[in-house]
């Protein structure tokens, strides 16, 4: 049993045997098992080659400046894994993140997930629980088959 964020992340780095395994079938099945709740009233997906992280931060700040509660998911992290998931600019709490990984693990059965898919599902779970007015999701490396495309966005 994994008890700390460090233990979860170390395990996730070795749990999926394929470096590149694009597609939405695995993450989609797990998200459905988790109930597939709506994340937020408004969902914005940020994609592209360069500047995605900056665009996420800018969009997050703009929404907050207009009084909206905002959740954001981006990757990779620069210094701490928790910075990938923010609520109104604040990093997610480590205990909340561990609980989210436990929820993903309970729903996945024998489905193998990539490191990014674990991150995305944990973020989706936490965002759906808090129900912010706006969720800003940064696409990873997968383009149209990226885990974030599991969530229907109103704007991209």
What does each model-found stretch correspond to?
Residues 1-19:
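Charged, amphipathic alpha-helical linker segments immediately N-terminal to NTP-binding catalytic cores
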Residues 7, 18-20, 24, 28-39, ...:
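ATP-dependent carboxylate-amine ligase catalytic core
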Residues 12-15, 44, 86-89:
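Residue-level detector of alpha-helix boundaries and kinks
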Residues 12-14, 32-42, 59:
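Non-catalytic interaction surface on structured domains
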Residues 42-46, 54-71:
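A conserved segment at the C-terminal end of the G1
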């Amino acid at each position: 049993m994994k008890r700390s964020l460090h233990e979860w992340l170390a395990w996730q780095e070795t749990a999926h045997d394929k470096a590149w395994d694009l597609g939405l079938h695995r993450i989609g099945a797990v998200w459905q098992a988790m109930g597939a709740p709506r994340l937020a009233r408004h969902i914005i997906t940020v994609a592209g080659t360069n500047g995605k992280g900056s665009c996420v931060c800018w969009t997050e700040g703009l929404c907050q400046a207009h009084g909206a509660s905002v959740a954001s998911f981006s990757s990779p992290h620069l210094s701490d894994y928790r910075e990938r998931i923010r609520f109104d600019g604040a990093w997610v709490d480590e205990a909340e993140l561990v609980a989210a990984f436990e929820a993903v693990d309970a729903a996945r059965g024998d489905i193998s997930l990539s490191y990014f898919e674990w991150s995305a599902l944990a973020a989706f779970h936490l965002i759906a629980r808090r129900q912010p007015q706006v969720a800003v999701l940064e696409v990873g490396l997968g383009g149209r088959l990226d885990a974030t495309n599991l969530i229907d966005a109103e704007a991209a």
